Amino acid sequence: MFNFNYGLRTITLNHPQKLNSLNGSMARKIIPRLQEWSKSQLANVVVVKGEGRALCAGGDVAALALQNKEGPEGQQKSKDYFALEYKLDHMIASYTKPYIAYMDGITMGGGVGLSLHAPFRIATEKTVFAMPETNIGFFPDVGGSFFLPRMDGQMGTYLALTSEQLKGVDVFWSGIATHYLHSSSLPDLETRLAELQFKDYDSLQQRLQVINSTIEEFCTGVPHDRHPSNSIVGGDLRVAIDYAFQNNSTIDQILEALQGLTENKGNTAPPSVIDWAAKTRKTILSRSPTSVRVALRQLREGATWDIAETFRKEHVIASRFMEHPDFVEGVSALLINKPKTTPQWKPKSLDKVTDADVDAFFAGQPSLELLNTEGKAEEIRYKDYPHAWTGLPREREVLGHVNRNRCTMKEAVEFFVQHSGGKQGVKEKVEEILRRKADESESGALTLKR
């Protein structure tokens, strides 16, 4: 459903009974509208939102699995669907007008593709985020290869392999959302966005700055009981995530690290970490072994891919999964069979998935032709989001500042608060990073931990 209100253009996904799951028909309707609005001088801002409990709970994977059972012809239809979806996601990632995603409710899979690459991603107390693909014999697609490895520390790898959910303000602390608002504020924000006026010669950057300030006006504070230090994105659990999923670790090394935390032989791990490690190890071992191994390699390689390369290579991987039995098995077990069944993965364990098996998912020349907003074949390329400044400071930015400038905690916090224009959550985020990653001398000067 498409709405017009002064300079605001709204895309509303309105299949609440199916949690607004994305299908080919919806994608085919959205793409030409985005192209039309990009050329319209009357369209200033685009908002995407969902009716009911979800922005979008994912693609209609049940329909794809049933299609795949038909054999090569059905599998080709599924491959064509992913080509269409990734073209839409790339268009959003390179859109020439301000684009805002209301992540107000369940935002998973295909819904992540509609929001993750937007310059503005608004979480609320109702937000539930996840990349659940390894649980259905698939991989974290829709540009996950780009976003996840660029998250702070090893959060992206953890979320990809486990399908773990983040809820509410934790979606904001993690950097997945750029802003956190109470859901009751969203209609008023929409009205305000419709009233915004820009000069014809205003650059995209200038327009984004105005919208950023406008959204901040509606921020009423973050929950006092969900400081980043007592959530999974900070504190002891975050230290454990970065340790267990550290760069260049193989899946066997990750499982070994989790086992070590579970056994706690040095008596150094708090009970919350011990419980988390045991649960996380069990979760990974229950996922599709093929999906887990492919996803880990995907994230390691995706850290160097540009945004266009990401979607083209993901289409190769997705096409291979449409031919693999685990996708049909996982979707059937979780979403089609009544009651749900336990999936029988093939191969059934991680040690049975060979390097050659994984290589096959990355083999072949990418052929996906991406579109720009004029409908022409064009690949917008960047290796980091040009609009990354709209969110909270990233860990590497905070640590880089401290490394370059001998400063105190107070000075570092003041710098980032001022640099962000007083953005909500900056103080808490910077403090949590520095308490976890730096030591203070008697004079208060910070030194990064080794």
Placement of each model-derived feature along the sequence:
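Hydrophobic, secondary-structure "cap" segments at the distal end of domains
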Residues: 146-154
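Glycine-rich beta-to-alpha active-site loop
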Residues: 92-136, 158-168, 179
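Hydrophobic/aromatic residues within transmembrane alpha-helices
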Residues: 48, 60, 114-115, 170-171, ...
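A structural preference for short, pocket-lining loop segments at secondary-structure junctions
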Residues: 6, 11, 29-72, 91-102, ...
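Amphipathic alpha-helical blocks and their helix-capping loop/short-beta junctions
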Residues: 182-287, 291
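Conserved CoA-thioester-binding segment of acyl-CoA-metabolizing enzymes
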Residues: 1-49, 364, 384-386, 393-450
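An acidic, glycine-rich surface segment that forms the CoA-thioester-binding/catalytic face
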Residues: 31, 62-103, 144-146, 359-362, ...
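Contiguous mid-protein beta-loop-alpha structural module that forms a pocket-lining wall or clamp
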Residues: 154-200
